[in-house]
Amino acid sequence: MRVIQTALMLCVASTQLCNAAGLERRNIDTDFLFADGMVVDLGVGSVSPSFTATQGGGFAFESGKNVAPSFSITTGSFKSEISDKLDLGIWHTTSGNGVNIDYGSVTGPGMTGAMNSSMTAVTNSGRIKADVSLPSTLLAAKYQMNDNWSLIGGMKYVSVSGGQLMLPMDIDGRDPATGAINPNGDLLIDTTSVWNFGSTQGTGAVLGFAYERPDIALRVSIINEAKIDLSVPTTSGGGVAANSNSEASIGDATTLAFQTGIAENTLLFGSVRRSNWANNQITIQTLGGPATITDFVDGKNYTLGIGRKFSDKLSGSLSYYYSDGDGDGASELSPYGDTKTVSLGAKYSINDNTDVSFGLSESERGDATTGNFAAKLTGSSVTSFGVKLTHRY
């Protein structure tokens, strides 16, 4: 059953392109360490969201604009069998975490004039935009302790290299009706501030273990990823400090995954993942001091699917993914509630050493109202497609 197990999981992996919690896009994958011999693979994916924001809380958004542009992800891995007990490998993705949001012009109440009681209320326009991508690299080893148990360990490396954030800012917090200091702290649009991010990186440990019974294609694994802190050099303008550091974290996460044969040439698989984002918000510097611009919640997601080997050359999979979430007060950078995804995967063996895998996912995102500008988003969806080439030496 080991050959069947490996073949099916190749097509399953090709469907896992976009995740839901915090800034997650493509979580690290340790399954490649379980392949036999020396293996290299390369995959590319396209993610096409459809998010439209409508008016709320006194702010107006561009009608019909898709606020979440499409993006692509490239993922690759290399694994070598050092001995009967030890495997070493490297896994990389161009966008393990990230955000690509552009609400365009946002119109709402603001102030003009000198910063005193003579200021007058006006209608101003600002812009909400964020474009940041965080590549992830995993260096990992698997040590086979006995016929059933193996130990997995390594380091995850996350980097930032450029990116930009644009937000409408309330410079002095004055009431638009009176010009007095606004006691309620209602958000106004006085200007659009811009933060340009520099380069930084961080590392975190990855530890876990797995139990296997190859005769029934059973594998159960638990993997823990440590938190990674990032202090990003930032230059900015438009009513904010000119030079500063922005603070962000990739929260710790634990993934429990399983797969088992349930009939000849048929595999049942699933996972439960818990990621910590509530304590890992993004903080930027303004004239008034540090400001938290996100309202991430902890991620809890579940996957269940079935894989089937149809012939020596063709295998397929079908899976369902669910991630809970509350759309009330959502972050402008991740404006959705829960996530429901159906994925299809297929793998075709070109020859004895080379496979090509395809994946297609259709995701429904729950309705949301963002916390700061009260943007209302309904009927949001994401379509993802990926292809992966695998070669064994």
Name each model feature, range by range.
Residues A21-L23, Q55, I82-Y393:
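Outer-membrane beta-barrel porins/channels
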Residues R2-Y103:
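N-terminal, post-signal peptide beta-strand-biased segments of exported outer-membrane/organellar beta-barrel
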Residues M1-R2, L10, Y143, L187:
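Residue-level marker of intrinsically disordered, low-complexity segments enriched
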